[in-house]
Amino acid sequence: MRQTITDDLDALLAVLPLRVREAIAGMEDRAELLEIVLDLGRLPEGRFPQREVILSDSPISREDLDGVVERIGRFGDDNRAGIGRTLHRISAIRNRRGEVVGLTCRVGRAVRGTVALIRDVVEQGRSILILGRP
């Protein structure tokens, strides 16, 4: 069974502040990246399965957040947005005035070639609950 993983990471990186984008692009293990946290006034952080990495020595500014929000577009009522034709999810944290004060950018990945393991169950047409780590 051959698996391929598609993450379209470049599409997610394209909406990030330049210094954050460059830090991630230069990492050898960027394929393992789980999420990027951009909180106002704090250092940007990349989260990997076994570690967390500071992505810049400059704290996230209002301009950084506004730029990302502008490139992403509209957030839903649940304060989430996506990037077209990808599985990436961006969650916004807002203050009481409704201003975005933080963004968590979750890397979405499609794993192709794995359905063979459960094809017979899927083809039964019944409900299935699949659990896994977030």
Q: Predicted regions: what is each one?
A:
Residues 1-82, 86:
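N-terminal accessory targeting/assembly segments
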Residues 41, 133-134:
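Short, ordered loop/turn segments at secondary-structure junctions
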Residues 56, 67-132:
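P-loop NTP-binding catalytic core
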